[in-house]
């Protein structure tokens, strides 16, 4: 699996250990759902202004958020593994928001970025949290991904 990382922000330094961590999170997320080792995901680190403009343009919500996902097959049923496109889509994470949330929730910045990466990966795979039941399923999968990597609160 390829994780193509693009850092478009300058506020927070992106260290090699963070790059390895997010790559591992994406790989475990996709493997746990039976996706091909040939699958690719784009991961883009941005600042609050950038993610705010994306959120306004694509969701009609004019405020910053922590993570957005853009699946290439948005609104379509996920194809069978052998029919799947190699590139699944992009995950966009605001690192300044992740840093604030880590402090607010009392855990590390890396743990927060790992969680947001798992959350975004699951959105690319068709999961959502529009209902309480869907939210619980998604949260269970997110925590399972982090546990497999030994990432705890």
From Swiss-Prot:
SUPFAM superfamilies the UniProt entry points to: Metalloproteases ('zincins'), catalytic domain
Subcellular location(s) per record: Cytoplasm
Primary location group: cytoplasm
UniProt keywords, alphabetically: Cytoplasm, Endonuclease, Hydrolase, Metal-binding, Nuclease, Ribosome biogenesis, rRNA processing, Zinc
GO MF, any single term: zinc ion binding
Cofactor: how bound: Binds 1 zinc ion.
Pfam families assigned to the protein according to its UniProt record, in alphabetical order: YbeY
GO biological process terms, semicolon-separated: rRNA processing
EC number, as in UniProt: 3.1.-.-
Keyword Metal-binding: yes
Gene3D superfamilies named among the record's database cross-references: Metalloproteases ('zincins'), catalytic domain
GO cellular component terms listed in the entry, alphabetical order: cytoplasm
Coiled coil, from the record: none
Keyword Lipid metabolism attached: no
EC primary class: hydrolase
Sites where the protein binds Zn(2+): 119, 123, 129
Alphabetized HAMAP family for the sequence: Endoribonucl_YbeY (MF_00009)
The protein's role, per its UniProt record: Single strand-specific metallo-endoribonuclease involved in late-stage 70S ribosome quality control and in maturation of the 3' terminus of the 16S rRNA.
Family per record: Belongs to the endoribonuclease YbeY family.
Name of the featured protein: Endoribonuclease YbeY
Species name: Desulforamulus reducens (strain ATCC BAA-1160 / DSM 100696 / MI-1)
Gene: ybeY
């Amino acid at each position: 699996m390829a994780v193509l990382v693009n850092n478009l922000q300058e506020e927070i330094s992106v260290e090699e250990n963070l790059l390895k961590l997010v790559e591992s999170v994406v790989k475990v997320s996709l493997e746990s759902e039976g996706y091909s080792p040939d699958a690719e995901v784009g991961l883009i680190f941005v600042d609050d202004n950038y993610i705010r403009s994306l959120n306004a343009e694509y969701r009609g919500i004019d405020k910053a958020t922590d993570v957005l996902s853009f699946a290439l097959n948005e609104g379509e049923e996920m194809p069978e593994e052998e029919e799947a496109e190699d590139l699944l889509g992009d995950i966009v994470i605001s690192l300044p928001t992740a840093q604030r949330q880590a402090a607010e929730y009392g855990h590390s910045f890396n743990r927060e970025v790992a969680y947001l990466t798992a959350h975004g990966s699951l959105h690319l795979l068709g999961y959502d949290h529009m209902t309480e039941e869907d939210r619980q399923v998604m949260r269970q999968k997110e925590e399972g991904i982090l546990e497999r990597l030994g990432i705890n609160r």
